[in-house]
Regions:
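A short alpha-helical cap/connector motif
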Residues: 1-145, 153-178, 182-215
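Active-site residues of response regulator receiver
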Residues: 149
Length: 215
């Protein structure tokens, strides 16, 4: 029996063509990303590396955003815009909305905007250049979904932990947070019942945390 090709919930050929192009161009430095460690803690040192979520994660983001009828979502970090495409496609297909992304490397901001334009989704995305601890401090109202998939940061609390503490109060009850890198202090936050979340680990990309805000 032949194995069927994975079916994407996104049926826009223009969007899928950009996603496929980005997948083909994906390159990662030795160490394999945040779980494998970096030779530099400076995100600018990897300005040409497009760290991205995997398609299965992106498709789950799209489906959850559709089910929520999401209209305002956010992400840290945008990188070259892979996750942004899935969010923006969901915003468009929901009838309108905005994904607010944060990216500190200027070259990646330009690449992400170009990829969104190529996919016909630029009108549904706002990429803020700079440190997410500043750029995501005001998301303009309650958000439905947040992706935290950014640089690990230096000594002390991870950037993921710092960012979740900033954006969690802006996430509506019933909204989701997805985390790709499993930073221990981030997991401590979302798994603490006092934080107002229930959380689970999904078998995607070696372990993806999905957290639902319940209070």
């Amino acid at each position: 029996m032949s194995q069927e090709q994975p079916h994407s919930p996104i049926q826009d050929a223009r969007v899928n063509a950009v996603i496929e192009r980005m997948q083909a161009a994906r390159r990662r430095p030795p160490g394999g990303g945040p779980r494998g460690g970096f030779s530099s803690r400076d995100p600018h040192a990897y300005a040409e590396q497009g760290f991205s979520i995997h398609p299965e994660q992106g498709e789950l983001i799209y489906m959850l955003c559709r089910s929520l009828r999401a209209t305002r979502v956010a992400e840290f970090a945008t990188s070259v815009g892979m996750s942004t495409l899935y969010f923006a496609a969901a915003m468009r297909d929901n009838g309108g909305g905005t994904v607010i992304g944060s990216e500190i490397v200027p070259a990646k901001v330009e690449t992400a905007r170009r990829n969104l334009d190529d996919a016909g989704l630029a009108a549904y995305a706002e990429i803020r250049e700079g440190d997410a601890r500043k750029t995501l401090r005001d998301l303009g109202g309650p958000v439905d979904f947040i992706l935290i998939d950014g640089w690990p940061g230096g000594e002390g609390p991870s950037l993921a932990r710092q960012v979740i503490e900033i954006v969690a109060p802006q996430l509506r009850v019933g909204g989701y947070v997805m985390n790709d890198n499993a930073e221990p202090d981030f997991l401590d936050f979302v798994r603490d019942p006092k934080s107002g979340f229930v959380s689970m680990t999904l078998p995607l990309k070696g372990g993806t945390e999905l957290s639902l805000k319940v209070a």
